[in-house]
């Protein structure tokens, strides 16, 4: 990898199986681990996420929760809100903006996620949430957010710093779930499953890079479109973000069934330059699966390649982490083939420098 050791991104290694068929190809994850095994394993074990100040709500339970964050820090909120949609007793909303909803108040739990601690949108949203009376917990490696926690006595989870935020997903996501579990918004079963997920990913690692390259063969040089069931949108966003940042690709994502009411019409101009990656899980709605099958025929009629990607594992949590790994490694393999540094984010750096000149 250009620019140094790819382990700086601490990515998981992916494997999956290619079905020998000309119809939509199915990729099922089988083995997965990451180079920094001990770091990932520690990050996925409950109560071992990072250095955490006591998080005790003393019986208080929020009526709603906001997870404030952007990019690699904010993806944990997008995924947690979807993963817990059918399990949390109150709404959990991912908030990726400078502002917060008007309903934010003293019954709101605001979880501020900023890896650097200096993300301006997150800090602005946090200020608005505090003024509205929200109760705050922070997840950060330090920076201004860490200073605010020290100043105001807010509980926080301090995660290791010095790496790209997207590479610290294991720490950030499990920290978010740790906070939500403490607030009684994340069920014990999901929370405890992280430990077995770590063991599963470490134990299953044969043929991983070879399999990742097989998927890259199918998408290299193509315009990538990502689709999933709406319940898996957080996962699909993670794939898009990793392809954007690591592989420097423009790609899009949409979800079923909503795309059936708009984007599907746009497929009248689809062609062989497109490749469709459809993420499927056993948890998908049965009617959504039917919609996917019909739409795959439409995509193929327009000349697009269609690949169905499935996760490996005996439960939803294992399959989820497996699919995260598939997307992460796909982005790194594509970056390597293109001679790109997956860590480099020149356009984002340019934007930040320009914004720093304007109060």
Task: Give the positions of each predicted feature.
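Short, small/acidic-rich helices and loops at N termini and domain boundaries
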Residues: 343-359
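Extreme N-terminal basic, low-complexity initiation segments
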Residues: 1-9
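Leucine-biased recognition of intrinsically disordered, low-complexity hydrophobic segments
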Residues: 9, 17-18
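A generic structural motif
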Residues: 94-96, 249-260, 305-314
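Active-site phosphate/pyrophosphate-binding segments
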Residues: 23-38, 45-55, 60-63, 179-275, ...
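Glycine-rich phosphate-binding loops that contact phosphosugars or nucleotide phosphates
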Residues: 13-14, 56-202, 279-286, 290-307
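C-terminal active-site/capping subdomain that shapes the small-molecule cofactor and substrate pocket
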Residues: 265, 272-346
């Amino acid at each position: 990898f250009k620019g140094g050791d790819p382990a700086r991104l601490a990515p998981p290694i992916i494997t999956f199986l290619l079905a020998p068929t000309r119809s939509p190809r199915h990729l099922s994850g089988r083995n997965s681990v990451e180079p920094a095994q001990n770091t990932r394993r520690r990050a996925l074990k409950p109560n071992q996420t990072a250095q955490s100040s006591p998080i005790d709500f003393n019986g208080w339970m929020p009526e709603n929760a906001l997870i404030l964050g952007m990019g690699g820090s904010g993806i944990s909120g997008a995924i947690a809100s979807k993963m817990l949609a059918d399990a949390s007793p109150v709404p959990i909303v991912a908030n990726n903006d400078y502002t917060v909803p008007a309903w934010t108040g003293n019954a709101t739990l605001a979880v501020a996620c900023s890896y650097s601690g200096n993300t301006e949108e997150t800090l602005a949203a946090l200020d608005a949430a505090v003024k509205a009376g929200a109760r705050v917990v922070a997840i950060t490696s330090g920076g201004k957010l860490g200073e605010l926690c020290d100043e105001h006595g807010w509980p926080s989870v301090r995660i290791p710093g010095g790496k790209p935020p997207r590479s610290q997903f294991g720490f950030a996501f499990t920290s978010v779930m740790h906070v939500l579990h403490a607030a009684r918004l994340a069920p014990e079963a999901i929370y405890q499953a992280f430990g077995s997920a770590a063991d599963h990913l470490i134990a299953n690692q044969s043929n991983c890079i070879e399999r990742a390259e097989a998927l890259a063969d199918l998408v290299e040089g193509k315009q990538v479109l990502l689709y999933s069931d709406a319940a898996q949108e957080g996962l699909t966003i993670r794939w898009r973000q990793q392809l954007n940042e690591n592989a420097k690709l423009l790609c899009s994502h949409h979800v079923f069934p909503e795309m059936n009411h708009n984007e599907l019409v746009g497929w009248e101009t689809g062609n062989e330059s497109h490749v469709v990656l459809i993420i499927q899980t056993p948890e998908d709605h049965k009617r959504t699966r039917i919609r996917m099958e019909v739409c795959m025929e439409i995509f193929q009629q327009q000349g697009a390649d269609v690949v169905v990607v499935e996760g490996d594992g005996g439960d939803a949590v294992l399959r989820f982490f497996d699919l995260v790994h598939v997307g992460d490694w796909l982005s790194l393999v594509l970056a390597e083939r293109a001679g790109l540094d997956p860590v480099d984010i020149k356009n984002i750096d340019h934007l930040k420098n320009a914004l720093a000149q304007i109060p």
